[in-house]
Regions:
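Hydrophobic alpha-helical segments within soluble ligand-binding/sensing domains
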Residues: 104, 163-186, 199-201, 227-231, ...
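An alpha-beta-alpha
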Residues: 61, 160-221, 244, 335
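Segments of small-molecule ligand-sensing domains
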Residues: 319-325, 336-394
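Beta-alpha junction/loop-to-helix N-cap segments that form part of ligand/metal-binding clefts
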Residues: 40-43, 68-72, 82-154, 163, ...
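N-terminal secretory signal peptides
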Residues: 1-13, 21-32
Length: 398
Protein backbone atom coordinates (compact mmCIF):
# COMPACT_ATOMS: atom_id res chain seq x y z
CA UNK A 1 0.00 0.00 0.00
CA UNK A 2 2.56 2.44 1.05
CA UNK A 3 5.60 4.24 -0.22
CA UNK A 4 5.16 7.68 1.30
CA UNK A 5 8.69 8.82 0.61
CA UNK A 6 10.28 6.03 2.61
CA UNK A 7 13.82 7.03 1.65
CA UNK A 8 15.98 4.06 0.82
CA UNK A 9 19.73 3.51 1.19
CA UNK A 10 22.18 0.64 1.13
CA UNK A 11 21.31 -1.31 4.26
CA UNK A 12 23.67 -4.25 3.75
CA UNK A 13 25.80 -3.94 6.84
CA UNK A 14 26.53 -5.90 9.96
CA UNK A 15 23.40 -5.78 12.09
CA UNK A 16 25.26 -5.70 15.38
CA UNK A 17 27.33 -2.70 14.27
CA UNK A 18 24.11 -0.75 13.90
CA UNK A 19 22.87 -1.98 17.26
CA UNK A 20 26.07 -0.74 18.84
CA UNK A 21 25.52 2.67 17.28
CA UNK A 22 21.96 2.76 18.60
CA UNK A 23 23.14 1.74 22.03
CA UNK A 24 25.60 4.61 21.96
CA UNK A 25 22.67 6.99 21.60
CA UNK A 26 20.94 5.43 24.59
CA UNK A 27 18.35 2.78 23.91
CA UNK A 28 15.96 4.10 26.51
CA UNK A 29 15.84 7.41 24.72
CA UNK A 30 15.14 5.79 21.36
CA UNK A 31 12.26 3.54 22.34
CA UNK A 32 9.05 5.32 21.45
CA UNK A 33 5.41 4.60 22.07
CA UNK A 34 2.28 4.80 19.95
CA UNK A 35 1.96 8.54 20.17
CA UNK A 36 3.71 11.39 18.44
CA UNK A 37 5.15 12.38 21.80
CA UNK A 38 6.99 9.07 22.15
CA UNK A 39 7.37 7.05 25.33
CA UNK A 40 7.47 3.38 26.20
CA UNK A 41 5.07 1.38 24.06
CA UNK A 42 5.26 -1.98 25.79
CA UNK A 43 1.90 -3.71 25.80
CA UNK A 44 0.57 -7.05 26.92
CA UNK A 45 -2.70 -8.77 27.63
CA UNK A 46 -3.67 -8.53 31.28
CA UNK A 47 -5.57 -11.81 30.89
CA UNK A 48 -2.69 -13.84 29.49
CA UNK A 49 -0.78 -16.45 31.47
CA UNK A 50 1.40 -17.35 28.51
CA UNK A 51 5.10 -16.86 28.05
CA UNK A 52 6.28 -13.52 26.72
CA UNK A 53 6.71 -13.20 22.94
CA UNK A 54 8.10 -9.88 21.71
CA UNK A 55 6.71 -8.19 18.60
CA UNK A 56 8.25 -5.02 17.20
CA UNK A 57 6.50 -2.33 15.17
CA UNK A 58 8.06 0.40 13.02
CA UNK A 59 6.49 3.39 11.30
CA UNK A 60 6.47 7.17 11.05
CA UNK A 61 4.98 8.60 14.23
CA UNK A 62 6.25 12.09 13.50
CA UNK A 63 6.51 13.99 10.24
CA UNK A 64 4.24 14.19 7.21
CA UNK A 65 3.33 10.48 7.23
CA UNK A 66 2.72 10.24 10.99
CA UNK A 67 -0.98 9.39 10.71
CA UNK A 68 -0.14 6.16 8.85
CA UNK A 69 2.57 5.07 11.28
CA UNK A 70 0.48 5.83 14.34
CA UNK A 71 -2.34 3.70 12.94
CA UNK A 72 0.05 0.80 12.38
CA UNK A 73 1.55 1.18 15.83
CA UNK A 74 -1.89 1.23 17.44
CA UNK A 75 -3.05 -1.76 15.42
CA UNK A 76 -0.04 -3.80 16.54
CA UNK A 77 -0.51 -2.80 20.16
CA UNK A 78 -4.22 -3.69 20.15
CA UNK A 79 -3.52 -6.95 18.32
CA UNK A 80 -0.95 -7.96 20.93
CA UNK A 81 -3.55 -7.49 23.64
CA UNK A 82 -6.33 -9.29 21.79
CA UNK A 83 -4.36 -12.31 20.55
CA UNK A 84 -2.48 -13.07 23.76
CA UNK A 85 -3.51 -16.43 25.24
CA UNK A 86 -2.40 -19.12 27.65
CA UNK A 87 0.57 -19.97 25.44
CA UNK A 88 1.74 -16.57 24.21
CA UNK A 89 1.68 -13.26 26.03
CA UNK A 90 2.38 -10.84 23.18
CA UNK A 91 4.34 -7.75 24.14
CA UNK A 92 4.99 -4.93 21.67
CA UNK A 93 7.39 -2.05 21.32
CA UNK A 94 7.36 0.47 18.49
CA UNK A 95 9.90 2.78 16.89
CA UNK A 96 9.52 6.00 14.92
CA UNK A 97 11.34 5.93 11.57
CA UNK A 98 9.90 9.17 10.10
CA UNK A 99 9.32 7.16 6.88
CA UNK A 100 13.09 7.11 6.30
CA UNK A 101 14.96 3.97 5.25
CA UNK A 102 18.12 4.59 7.25
CA UNK A 103 16.22 5.54 10.40
CA UNK A 104 14.04 2.48 9.92
CA UNK A 105 17.06 0.17 9.95
CA UNK A 106 18.28 1.88 13.12
CA UNK A 107 14.83 1.31 14.61
CA UNK A 108 14.94 -2.34 13.56
CA UNK A 109 18.27 -2.89 15.26
CA UNK A 110 17.10 -1.17 18.43
CA UNK A 111 14.17 -3.58 18.55
CA UNK A 112 16.45 -6.53 17.81
CA UNK A 113 18.60 -5.51 20.77
CA UNK A 114 15.41 -5.40 22.89
CA UNK A 115 14.82 -9.05 21.97
CA UNK A 116 12.24 -8.74 19.21
CA UNK A 117 11.16 -12.17 17.94
CA UNK A 118 9.00 -10.93 15.04
CA UNK A 119 8.46 -7.59 13.31
CA UNK A 120 5.09 -6.27 12.18
CA UNK A 121 6.38 -3.41 10.06
CA UNK A 122 7.69 -1.15 8.73
CA UNK A 123 4.82 0.98 7.47
CA UNK A 124 6.17 2.60 4.31
CA UNK A 125 7.60 0.90 1.25
CA UNK A 126 11.02 2.57 1.10
CA UNK A 127 11.61 1.83 4.76
CA UNK A 128 10.36 -1.73 4.34
CA UNK A 129 12.69 -2.42 1.43
CA UNK A 130 15.63 -1.22 3.53
CA UNK A 131 14.66 -3.17 6.65
CA UNK A 132 13.83 -6.34 4.70
CA UNK A 133 17.42 -6.48 3.46
CA UNK A 134 18.65 -6.54 7.06
CA UNK A 135 15.92 -8.83 8.41
CA UNK A 136 16.81 -11.40 5.75
CA UNK A 137 20.47 -11.51 6.80
CA UNK A 138 21.78 -13.91 9.41
CA UNK A 139 20.74 -13.81 12.17
CA UNK A 140 17.31 -13.51 10.57
CA UNK A 141 14.21 -12.03 12.18
CA UNK A 142 10.76 -12.74 10.76
CA UNK A 143 9.10 -9.68 9.18
CA UNK A 144 5.57 -9.02 7.99
CA UNK A 145 4.81 -5.50 6.79
CA UNK A 146 1.21 -4.35 7.21
CA UNK A 147 1.20 -1.74 4.48
CA UNK A 148 4.22 -1.80 2.16
CA UNK A 149 2.96 -3.00 -1.21
CA UNK A 150 5.93 -3.08 -3.60
CA UNK A 151 7.08 -6.49 -4.77
CA UNK A 152 10.64 -5.28 -4.04
CA UNK A 153 9.96 -5.73 -0.32
CA UNK A 154 9.69 -9.53 -0.45
CA UNK A 155 11.65 -10.29 -3.62
CA UNK A 156 14.37 -12.87 -3.01
CA UNK A 157 13.65 -13.15 0.73
CA UNK A 158 12.27 -16.23 2.45
CA UNK A 159 11.28 -14.64 5.77
CA UNK A 160 9.53 -11.43 4.65
CA UNK A 161 5.75 -11.24 4.10
CA UNK A 162 3.08 -8.65 3.31
CA UNK A 163 -0.45 -8.08 4.63
CA UNK A 164 -1.66 -5.64 1.99
CA UNK A 165 -2.10 -6.17 -1.74
CA UNK A 166 0.86 -5.76 -4.04
CA UNK A 167 0.80 -2.74 -6.33
CA UNK A 168 0.25 -4.78 -9.53
CA UNK A 169 -2.65 -6.61 -7.89
CA UNK A 170 -4.43 -3.35 -7.08
CA UNK A 171 -3.94 -1.86 -10.52
CA UNK A 172 -5.20 -4.95 -12.32
CA UNK A 173 -8.26 -5.36 -10.09
CA UNK A 174 -9.17 -1.68 -10.34
CA UNK A 175 -9.05 -1.78 -14.14
CA UNK A 176 -11.19 -4.91 -14.25
CA UNK A 177 -13.76 -3.39 -11.89
CA UNK A 178 -13.97 -0.17 -13.90
CA UNK A 179 -14.24 -2.06 -17.18
CA UNK A 180 -17.15 -4.07 -15.80
CA UNK A 181 -18.98 -1.14 -14.23
CA UNK A 182 -17.79 2.10 -15.85
CA UNK A 183 -16.64 0.94 -19.25
CA UNK A 184 -18.21 3.88 -21.11
CA UNK A 185 -16.30 6.55 -19.17
CA UNK A 186 -13.29 8.45 -20.48
CA UNK A 187 -10.47 8.24 -17.97
CA UNK A 188 -7.67 10.43 -16.77
CA UNK A 189 -4.96 8.54 -14.90
CA UNK A 190 -3.69 10.75 -12.08
CA UNK A 191 -0.77 9.65 -9.90
CA UNK A 192 2.37 10.61 -7.99
CA UNK A 193 5.28 9.86 -10.32
CA UNK A 194 7.77 10.07 -7.46
CA UNK A 195 5.98 7.53 -5.28
CA UNK A 196 6.50 3.80 -5.86
CA UNK A 197 3.06 2.87 -4.51
CA UNK A 198 1.22 5.32 -6.75
CA UNK A 199 3.30 4.76 -9.88
CA UNK A 200 3.36 0.98 -9.37
CA UNK A 201 -0.42 0.78 -9.35
CA UNK A 202 -0.64 3.21 -12.28
CA UNK A 203 1.67 1.06 -14.42
CA UNK A 204 -0.33 -2.10 -13.76
CA UNK A 205 -3.59 -0.22 -14.32
CA UNK A 206 -2.46 1.06 -17.74
CA UNK A 207 -1.52 -2.42 -18.89
CA UNK A 208 -4.80 -3.97 -17.76
CA UNK A 209 -6.81 -0.98 -19.02
CA UNK A 210 -5.49 -1.58 -22.52
CA UNK A 211 -6.47 -5.24 -22.31
CA UNK A 212 -9.89 -4.36 -20.87
CA UNK A 213 -10.50 -1.70 -23.56
CA UNK A 214 -10.78 1.23 -21.15
CA UNK A 215 -10.34 4.61 -22.83
CA UNK A 216 -7.61 6.67 -21.15
CA UNK A 217 -7.72 10.15 -22.70
CA UNK A 218 -5.19 11.81 -20.40
CA UNK A 219 -2.41 11.03 -17.94
CA UNK A 220 -1.44 13.57 -15.29
CA UNK A 221 1.23 13.34 -12.62
CA UNK A 222 2.59 15.23 -9.64
CA UNK A 223 5.40 14.87 -7.11
CA UNK A 224 5.62 15.17 -3.35
CA UNK A 225 6.65 18.82 -3.44
CA UNK A 226 3.64 19.85 -5.54
CA UNK A 227 0.57 18.62 -3.66
CA UNK A 228 -1.06 21.93 -2.76
CA UNK A 229 -2.98 22.43 -6.01
CA UNK A 230 -3.92 20.21 -8.93
CA UNK A 231 -5.89 22.80 -10.89
CA UNK A 232 -3.53 22.72 -13.88
CA UNK A 233 -3.78 18.94 -14.21
CA UNK A 234 -7.55 19.01 -13.83
CA UNK A 235 -7.88 21.73 -16.44
CA UNK A 236 -6.00 19.57 -18.96
CA UNK A 237 -8.10 16.53 -18.11
CA UNK A 238 -11.32 18.49 -18.52
CA UNK A 239 -10.18 19.88 -21.88
CA UNK A 240 -9.48 16.34 -23.09
CA UNK A 241 -12.97 15.20 -22.14
CA UNK A 242 -12.17 13.00 -19.14
CA UNK A 243 -15.32 12.00 -17.27
CA UNK A 244 -13.67 9.87 -14.59
CA UNK A 245 -10.42 10.02 -12.64
CA UNK A 246 -8.49 6.95 -11.57
CA UNK A 247 -6.13 8.18 -8.85
CA UNK A 248 -4.02 5.63 -6.95
CA UNK A 249 -2.91 8.23 -4.41
CA UNK A 250 -3.13 8.81 -0.67
CA UNK A 251 -6.05 10.45 1.04
CA UNK A 252 -4.37 13.80 1.77
CA UNK A 253 -3.65 14.71 -1.89
CA UNK A 254 -6.98 13.10 -2.83
CA UNK A 255 -8.78 15.61 -0.60
CA UNK A 256 -6.99 18.44 -2.44
CA UNK A 257 -7.91 16.93 -5.81
CA UNK A 258 -11.60 16.72 -4.91
CA UNK A 259 -11.67 20.29 -3.60
CA UNK A 260 -9.91 21.63 -6.69
CA UNK A 261 -12.37 19.85 -8.99
CA UNK A 262 -15.30 21.26 -7.02
CA UNK A 263 -13.89 24.78 -7.01
CA UNK A 264 -13.52 24.79 -10.80
CA UNK A 265 -16.95 23.26 -11.40
CA UNK A 266 -15.53 20.07 -12.87
CA UNK A 267 -18.14 17.36 -12.33
CA UNK A 268 -16.11 14.18 -12.65
CA UNK A 269 -16.30 10.72 -11.09
CA UNK A 270 -13.29 9.44 -9.18
CA UNK A 271 -11.86 6.15 -7.95
CA UNK A 272 -8.85 5.40 -5.76
CA UNK A 273 -7.29 2.41 -4.03
CA UNK A 274 -6.50 1.44 -0.45
CA UNK A 275 -4.25 4.45 0.17
CA UNK A 276 -7.33 6.66 -0.11
CA UNK A 277 -8.93 4.95 2.87
CA UNK A 278 -9.05 7.61 5.59
CA UNK A 279 -10.15 10.53 3.43
CA UNK A 280 -13.21 11.15 5.60
CA UNK A 281 -10.89 11.87 8.52
CA UNK A 282 -8.68 14.49 6.83
CA UNK A 283 -8.61 17.56 9.04
CA UNK A 284 -10.44 20.54 7.54
CA UNK A 285 -11.78 18.55 4.57
CA UNK A 286 -15.40 19.04 3.53
CA UNK A 287 -16.47 15.40 3.48
CA UNK A 288 -19.48 16.18 1.30
CA UNK A 289 -16.98 16.47 -1.57
CA UNK A 290 -16.25 12.75 -1.18
CA UNK A 291 -19.85 11.71 -1.83
CA UNK A 292 -19.82 9.19 -4.67
CA UNK A 293 -16.08 8.56 -4.38
CA UNK A 294 -15.12 4.98 -5.21
CA UNK A 295 -12.19 3.23 -3.59
CA UNK A 296 -10.90 -0.31 -3.59
CA UNK A 297 -9.92 -1.47 -0.12
CA UNK A 298 -10.26 -4.67 1.91
CA UNK A 299 -11.39 -2.88 5.10
CA UNK A 300 -14.35 -0.74 6.06
CA UNK A 301 -14.91 0.64 9.54
CA UNK A 302 -18.63 0.76 8.68
CA UNK A 303 -18.84 -3.00 8.10
CA UNK A 304 -20.81 -4.56 10.96
CA UNK A 305 -18.43 -7.53 10.91
CA UNK A 306 -15.69 -5.18 12.12
CA UNK A 307 -17.78 -3.52 14.83
CA UNK A 308 -15.97 -5.08 17.81
CA UNK A 309 -12.57 -4.03 16.50
CA UNK A 310 -13.76 -0.53 15.68
CA UNK A 311 -15.23 -0.10 19.16
CA UNK A 312 -12.10 -1.41 20.89
CA UNK A 313 -9.90 0.85 18.76
CA UNK A 314 -12.05 3.91 19.43
CA UNK A 315 -12.07 3.16 23.15
CA UNK A 316 -8.30 2.80 23.22
CA UNK A 317 -7.22 5.60 20.86
CA UNK A 318 -10.18 7.95 20.51
CA UNK A 319 -10.52 7.68 16.74
CA UNK A 320 -11.93 5.46 14.02
CA UNK A 321 -9.42 2.90 12.69
CA UNK A 322 -8.33 3.04 9.07
CA UNK A 323 -6.93 0.29 6.88
CA UNK A 324 -3.39 0.83 8.17
CA UNK A 325 -4.58 -0.09 11.67
CA UNK A 326 -6.58 -3.06 10.40
CA UNK A 327 -3.67 -4.40 8.35
CA UNK A 328 -1.36 -4.13 11.37
CA UNK A 329 -3.89 -5.94 13.55
CA UNK A 330 -4.11 -8.69 10.92
CA UNK A 331 -0.31 -8.83 10.90
CA UNK A 332 -0.27 -9.71 14.59
CA UNK A 333 -3.07 -12.21 13.96
CA UNK A 334 -0.92 -13.86 11.28
CA UNK A 335 2.06 -14.12 13.63
CA UNK A 336 -0.16 -15.70 16.29
CA UNK A 337 -1.56 -18.26 13.83
CA UNK A 338 1.88 -19.06 12.41
CA UNK A 339 3.31 -19.60 15.90
CA UNK A 340 0.48 -22.02 16.64
CA UNK A 341 0.95 -23.83 13.32
CA UNK A 342 4.70 -24.16 13.90
CA UNK A 343 4.24 -25.28 17.52
CA UNK A 344 6.90 -22.89 18.76
CA UNK A 345 7.42 -22.03 22.43
CA UNK A 346 7.08 -18.41 23.51
CA UNK A 347 10.77 -18.15 24.33
CA UNK A 348 11.89 -19.36 20.90
CA UNK A 349 15.10 -17.82 19.57
CA UNK A 350 14.31 -15.15 16.94
CA UNK A 351 16.45 -16.83 14.28
CA UNK A 352 14.81 -20.22 14.79
CA UNK A 353 11.42 -18.53 14.82
CA UNK A 354 12.13 -16.76 11.53
CA UNK A 355 12.47 -19.85 9.35
CA UNK A 356 9.71 -21.80 11.07
CA UNK A 357 7.25 -18.91 11.00
CA UNK A 358 7.99 -18.39 7.30
CA UNK A 359 7.26 -22.05 6.60
CA UNK A 360 4.05 -21.91 8.64
CA UNK A 361 2.82 -18.78 6.84
CA UNK A 362 2.26 -20.72 3.62
CA UNK A 363 0.06 -23.22 5.48
CA UNK A 364 -2.25 -20.97 7.49
CA UNK A 365 -5.48 -19.18 6.66
CA UNK A 366 -6.28 -16.05 8.64
CA UNK A 367 -9.86 -14.84 8.82
CA UNK A 368 -8.95 -11.23 9.44
CA UNK A 369 -10.39 -7.75 9.40
CA UNK A 370 -9.18 -7.25 5.83
CA UNK A 371 -10.52 -10.52 4.47
CA UNK A 372 -9.52 -14.17 4.40
CA UNK A 373 -5.75 -14.17 4.03
CA UNK A 374 -3.36 -16.81 2.69
CA UNK A 375 0.25 -16.43 1.55
CA UNK A 376 2.43 -17.90 -1.17
CA UNK A 377 6.12 -18.75 -0.80
CA UNK A 378 7.04 -15.33 -2.20
CA UNK A 379 5.53 -13.65 0.85
CA UNK A 380 2.63 -12.19 -1.12
CA UNK A 381 -0.87 -12.22 0.32
CA UNK A 382 -3.95 -13.53 -1.43
CA UNK A 383 -7.24 -11.88 -0.47
CA UNK A 384 -10.14 -10.32 -2.33
CA UNK A 385 -10.32 -6.54 -2.71
CA UNK A 386 -13.70 -4.87 -2.32
CA UNK A 387 -14.92 -1.74 -4.08
CA UNK A 388 -16.75 0.76 -1.88
CA UNK A 389 -18.59 3.97 -2.66
CA UNK A 390 -18.99 6.75 -0.11
CA UNK A 391 -22.67 7.52 0.51
CA UNK A 392 -23.91 9.79 3.28
CA UNK A 393 -20.45 9.81 4.80
CA UNK A 394 -20.16 6.02 5.02
CA UNK A 395 -18.60 3.21 3.00
CA UNK A 396 -21.16 1.18 1.06
CA UNK A 397 -20.14 -1.80 -1.03
CA UNK A 398 -20.28 -0.79 -4.68
Amino acid sequence: MSSLNGKSFNPVMNRRSVIASAAGLGVAGILAGCSSEGGDSGSASANSNGGEFKIGAIGPKTGAAASYGLSVCNGVELGCKDFSNDTYNFVSKSEDDVADGEKSVTAFNTLADWGMQALVGPTTTGASVAVAEVAAQDPQIFMITPSASSTDVTKGKTNVFQVCFTDPNQGVNAAKFLAANYGDEKFVLFYNSGDSYSSGIADAFKEQAAESKLEIVDEETFKDDSQTSFTNQLTKAKEKGATMIFAPIYYTPASVLLKNASDMGYEVKMMGCDGMDGILGVEGFDTSLAEGLLLMTPFSADDENNADFVKAYKDAYGKTPDQFAADAYDGVHAVAEALKEAGLPADVDPTEASSKLADAMTKITVKGLTGTLTWNDKGEVQKDPTAYVIKDGKYVQA
